[in-house]
A protein has these predicted regions:
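Alpha-helical scaffold/interaction cores of sigma-54-like transcription cofactors
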Residues: 1-665
Length: 665
């Protein structure tokens, strides 16, 4: 307990632990150490951090045994020890304890943390894929940790409810967002109040360009009404018009532009606090757009929240995870197999063949026609190939893809400016693809520290010329000290400067590629079950469903129409391996009607006829409109005796068979 720590540890013990490195070496002066302690909240707070850090270490080492085996090799043990020490000395162990408590699939830079991997926060081994911890948490760059957590669309709400119940409704809050008046919106709002004719208001808005022309200094001015008036003669005329309504509209729009117009709720941001959140920030309520319920909200937006010291958690809903979940349910239902998607082989031949053939429609990240073309040319054979393609297939680095493909097939020589560079560029055939490669190579070539390599990555990515000019001599001097030719070092530096702004975060690319691989694995090995899952998540988009049905046809999978005794709410797979249309995808059939049909079918068996159906279901829920839509879609074809047209064709008395059927029911 915290009390026991207070009895057994002196302030001097804590000072040493929090100001030395992970190996007990003194790395800062007494004065700097005291500043650091003060920044962490003083010695009183350190007892709590130490308690949390020790518990975090216990969980991490337990997880490490499962992930890496027992005993740990030296590299892994050193990595975990270093990460735990940084987390502790930056005051963040409590954050990781909370995240591992509710996590399912973290992504982003957190994938660079071996501790996060051991805790089950991420599913990618950062040591195996050269993902860097300091890309996530850098001791030289005091910034709050940020783990984006992806949940399937249905699971996100459940997790938020669980977090609210666990930590208390008064201790958690969503984050407010403020919508401001943009240039065109300011004009429209003022024109409406001024009763300016709509045609004139629309004409004014049409005069506002999407982008202003370059000024005399060669820079593009910021888009606002003042700058637009300076650039557009017609707007200048409106500003000085003899028409008072027109003139005032411009005048008031200039005053109101940029002001807050409305509020909303941050799509994924969430605050968890140890105390009542209103003790830290002002709170309010806001309506959830989807459910209409009142949500507890901060009155500060995200960037201000961080300045208060509270940590923002991101709970994201990812449609792809919902598709994977649907596919796994279909596999269980149709084949009786409980597949653990996180334990599939990363070297599955069928999956790589699918990528080599470019058959990626319906999979994550790799389904665009351009990507399919490059995959067929590349013939990926390793997971590293997929990560690289994911990182390269974006504006800018896309120009390197032909060279990447040629080098893989031996059509272009793979060269390294220095032999030591092969270690980190081998997997990408000598091409610098990731920010992490620049960081690792700067350490290898010029003895940059972890913090310095991250600062270099940031400076190159954001083209911070002054910072780069400051770091250049250190790179050259460090490289010369290691015996490297200054001319070669200069070439490497210039190559990095040219490409680093395009270089992608490998942690992100790896996480996304892993989810993409999972979808491709399911499509390659359980095609019917996977495609049914994809279509189920596009129920409302008939064009997408039609495209996916064409893909199923090309795969040799039949997509059967809806059937009252075989269909479910969503698309499913029958005993023959065919996909059966979901009744929920039939236009005009509500979800409640389908659930009523399914509940009765489960309870009392299949329906023997349409008469049996209307006798057994609640016709106020499953009404005439639903029955008509199902009949015309062919859901009753299996009963025989009556065609679809006969359900809606009037008899001699003007009544349709469907009317009589409902009356009978």
């Amino acid at each position: 307990t915290e009390e026991e720590y207070r009895k057994n540890l002196t302030e001097e013990d804590l000072f040493n632990e929090f100001t030395q490195d992970e190996n007990g070496n003194v790395v800062m002066s007494r004065e700097d150490g005291m500043k650091k302690i003060k920044k962490l909240g003083g010695f009183d707070k350190l007892y709590r951090i130490k308690l949390e850090a020790d518990y975090l270490a216990k969980l991490a080492y337990e997880g490490a045994k499962k992930r890496y085996g027992d005993p740990l090799d030296d590299e892994t043990a050193e990595r975990i020890k270093f990460e735990l020490h940084i987390m502790k000395t930056m005051g963040f162990p409590g954050y990781f304890l909370i995240v591992q408590d509710y996590i399912r699939a973290g992504r982003g830079s957190a994938a660079g943390s071996a501790v996060a991997y051991c805790l089950g926060i991420t599913q990618i081994d950062p040591i195996k894929y050269d993902l860097l911890f300091e890309r996530f948490l850098n001791p030289d760059r005091i910034s709050l940790p940020d783990i984006d957590v992806d949940f399937d669309d249905d699971g996100r709400g459940r997790v938020l409810n669980w977090v609210t119940q666990k930590y208390g409704a008064d201790n958690v809050a969503h984050i407010i967002t403020y919508g401001t008046m943009a240039t065109k919106l300011a004009i429209k709002d003022v024109a409406r109040v001024q009763k300016l004719p709509l045609s004139i208001s629309n004409n004014l808005c049409k005069l506002i360009p999407d982008k202003l022309p370059e000024g005399p200094d060669g820079k593009v001015p910021k888009m606002n009404l003042t700058n637009a008036i300076a650039a557009i003669p017609e707007l200048r005329e409106a500003e000085t018009s003899s028409d008072i309504l027109l003139r005032d509209t411009i005048r008031y729009a200039k005053m109101l532009e940029g002001n807050v117009r409305n509020t909303g709720v941050h799509a994924c941001g969430f605050i968890i606090c140890r105390d009542n959140i209103s003790d830290w920030v002002p709170v309010s309520t806001a309506k959830d757009k989807e459910t209409g319920e009142e949500l507890h909200c901060t009155q500060y937006e995200g960037r201000v929240i961080e300045e208060t010291g509270l940590i923002k958690m991101d709970f994201l809903g990812l449609k792809t995870l919902s598709i994977i979940k649907e596919a796994l349910e279909n596999i269980k239902l149709s084949l009786g197999i409980d597949l653990n998607i996180d334990e599939i082989s990363i070297e599955d031949p069928a999956t790589y063949q699918l990528y080599c053939d470019g058959r990626t429609i319906g999979t994550f990240q790799f389904e665009s026609p351009g990507m399919q073309k490059y995959l067929r040319e590349l013939q990926p054979s390793t997971f590293e190939d997929l990560i690289a393609m994911n990182a390269l297939y974006r504006p800018g680095p896309m120009q390197y893809i032909p060279s990447f493909i040629a080098r893989k097939h031996g059509d272009e020589p793979i060269t390294y400016d220095l032999p030591c560079m092969e270690k980190y560029l081998k997997d990408t055939y000598g091409i610098t693809v990731y920010q992490e490669q620049v960081m690792l190579l700067s350490r290898e070539i010029a003895n940059f520290t972890r913090g310095e390599s991250d600062a270099l990555r940031k400076a190159m990515g954001k083209k911070l010329i002054e910072k780069l000019n400051h770091m250049y001599p250190k790179f050259i001097d460090g490289g010369k000290a290691n015996g490297h030719d200054p001319k070669v070092l200069e070439k490497i530096w210039n190559d990095w400067r040219a490409f680093a702004s395009y270089a992608f975060n490998k942690s992100h690319a790896t996480c996304y590629s892993w989810v993409a691989y999972q979808t491709a694995y399911l499509k390659a090995n359980y095609p019917s079950q996977y495609m049914a899952g994809v279509m189920s998540r596009s129920l409302a988009d008939i064009n997408t469903v039609a495209k996916l049905m064409d893909e199923c046809k090309s795969m040799g999978i039949s997509t059967l129409g809806p059937d009252i005794n075989e269909s479910y709410l969503k698309f499913s797979v029958n005993h023959s391996g065919d996909i059966r249309f979901g009744m929920g995808a039939v236009k005009g059939v509500g979800e409640s009607a389908v659930l009523q049909i399914l509940a009765e079918r489960k309870k009392n068996g299949v329906y023997k006829s349409v008469y049996d159906l209307v006798e057994r279901v609640n016709l106020s829920t499953c009404n005439k409109k639903s029955l008509e839509s199902l009949a015309l879609a062919g859901a009753f074809d299996s009963f025989g005796n009556i065609t679809r047209e006969q359900f809606v064709t009037p008899c001699e008395n003007g009544e349709t068979f469907l009317d009589a059927l409902v009356r009978y029911g």
